[in-house]
Swiss-Prot record:
Site (Required for function): E188, D260, E286, K288
The protein's assembly and partners: Interacts with major DNA-binding protein; this interaction increases the nuclease processivity of the alkaline exonuclease.
Cellular localization per UniProt: Host nucleus; Host cytoplasm
EC number of the protein: 3.1.-.-
Organism: Varicella-zoster virus (strain Dumas) (HHV-3)
Keywords recorded for this protein, A-Z: Endonuclease, Exonuclease, Host cytoplasm, Host nucleus, Host-virus interaction, Hydrolase, Nuclease
Protein name per UniProt: Alkaline nuclease
Annotated GO CC locations: host cell cytoplasm; host cell nucleus
Pfam entry (one): Viral_alk_exo
Purpose: Plays a role in processing non linear or branched viral DNA intermediates in order to promote the production of mature packaged unit-length linear progeny viral DNA molecules. Exhibits endonuclease and exonuclease activities and accepts both double-stranded and single-stranded DNA as substrate. Exonuclease digestion of DNA is in the 5'-> 3' direction and the products are 5'-monophosphate nucleosides. Additionally, forms a recombinase with the major DNA-binding protein, which displays strand exchange activity.
Amino acid sequence: MARSGLDRIDISPQPAKKIARVGGLQHPFVKTDINTINVEHHFIDTLQKTSPNMDCRGMTAGIFIRLSHMYKILTTLESPNDVTYTTPGSTNALFFKTSTQPQEPRPEELASKLTQDDIKRILLTIESETRGQGDNAIWTLLRRNLITASTLKWSVSGPVIPPQWFYHHNTTDTYGDAAAMAFGKTNEPAARAIVEALFIDPADIRTPDHLTPEATTKFFNFDMLNTKSPSLLVGTPRIGTYECGLLIDVRTGLIGASLDVLVCDRDPLTGTLNPHPAETDISFFEIKCRAKYLFDPDDKNNPLGRTYTTLINRPTMANLRDFLYTIKNPCVSFFGPSANPSTREALITDHVEWKRLGFKGGRALTELDAHHLGLNRTISSRVWVFNDPDIQKGTITTIAWATGDTALQIPVFANPRHANFKQIAVQTYVLSGYFPALKLRPFLVTFIGRVRRPHEVGVPLRVDTQAAAIYEYNWPTIPPHCAVPVIAVLTPIEVDVPRVTQILKDTGNNAITSALRSLRWDNLHPAVEEESVDCANGTTSLLRATEKPLL
């Protein structure tokens, strides 16, 4: 299959034309201002022209609406009259395996032409070409008008999709304040390095790409850090070892997810996700950097600095608990064996040794949350604590606990009521649509870091662990702009995939059906009031077709 050429776009600020040589072919590209592409207008136009009763051959209308929309956006980028173009014909090659298509295909036409395998092939190519996420122009464009894993809201009755979801183009994450989000974005590379160095089983990495006796390739494609990726030629950041692009729900076309770290083999020629025949499961990691623990280790008046020093000198579970409980709202919330957890924190415990004075339980659980609480209650987290860095060597290592182990098991697990758990549940749902036969193993990673001392500023820190040696010359490294790691917590998460799948699939399909009927009515009766239905909770609201969308 020919590569789509969709990520051959340089989005750096200075305008200039270049030639990128990829696979022996020359592909012209120019720099782009993605704001010139009216994504919202076209998506709504596609919805308005789609029949609610179209024949989808056992599939859903939403996926073909999404594909038709993406086709329009991608071919727009090919137009030499626009500010940006990708390789002419690349979109048709991706969708129809031909360089020509007489006209823009409507959803009904795509439904008659594309098989389920075709849909997966197209969407897996999109995922590959959108790695780099926020630094990738295609990722930014195609993410609009999607309900994303990080922005989907949940009520007591389940996931909530707003009645006018198709007008919403601002998919900025809304969890936490601006300072906390900035801290997370800044320190995510540090957490990624820790994940690579400590959390990924080396057995997951050195599996051969071929099982035949004559096979010579003895590593996953991602072991090579995707050094042949076209993205390296056009100014987008270097694609990391386990980076993931935009995964679009193959069931409804409505929901999207971009995983922080995804451990899955890729096709060495196309870069698309392609699990090895020997793989039985796929691990992925959601990273959360906790800004509220940031402290200056030399500030004698800061209680975090004091409990940190105690933990470093005497690494025990009691001292770890004291450090985590130093702040007013710690990242671990105790709720008691007979109580319910609140929605406050992503990590919870009911272990008596972690009881905290003044704790408050939460309201009654929904049936789904209670079910997931039961699935996760017996799961333990693992914790690593880091030594002060060796600046001369440029390395940082983990501390051995009193038990002699580098990781400590603690009775802390994921909170099914928290937004982080919901986000991971949605990610699991989206990924399961591509690989239904494989066991998905999601993890929540909690990163805690401290301010750098003056002599540590500007120094990259190699995470020096035995497992990290498998990366050879691409050793996981804490970038110089990141905080110094103090603690990393790895929490496995158990999601009832079949149950979540049914809920999200039904919610998505209902939202699409409601949108098709609503917008089709608007076209026929532009001045008539109508009821718009929230498919998640059954509520209705009066909208006028003449009202301008809230963009």
